[in-house]
Amino acid sequence: MDIQTEAKIMRIFISSTDKFKHAPLYQIIVYLAKRNGLAGATVFRGTMGYGPSSQHIYQPTFWEIVDKTPMVIEIVDDAAKIEAFFNILKPYLEIIRTGCLITCEKADVLFYKKGEKKKNFFSL
């Protein structure tokens, strides 16, 4: 990602129980982003939330753990790469039976640096 170009942030709102061919949808999205060369993706697990087709507001109580929680995947990259990735992602989302929301907005990237790869212990 070049910080001199216009950047965008894509947010994908799904549920932790959403699947694509028996795999968690959030994993599929992150692997697709990596495979397509996007700068990075982060998955956030929400504490509480609901969507347009929700019957309940999902939240854990003191004595239980709820399997179904809201998830947000954030991907930041150049505007052109984000738009191209949306076109790759859209067919996957049209196939699934569950709901989904995607937002996109301009992002001002203040700093972006790739980390150095760790040296293997045996290559010292």
Describe each model-derived feature in a short phrase:
Residues 1-124:
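Positively charged, small/polar-rich N-terminal and surface patches that mediate targeting and assembly
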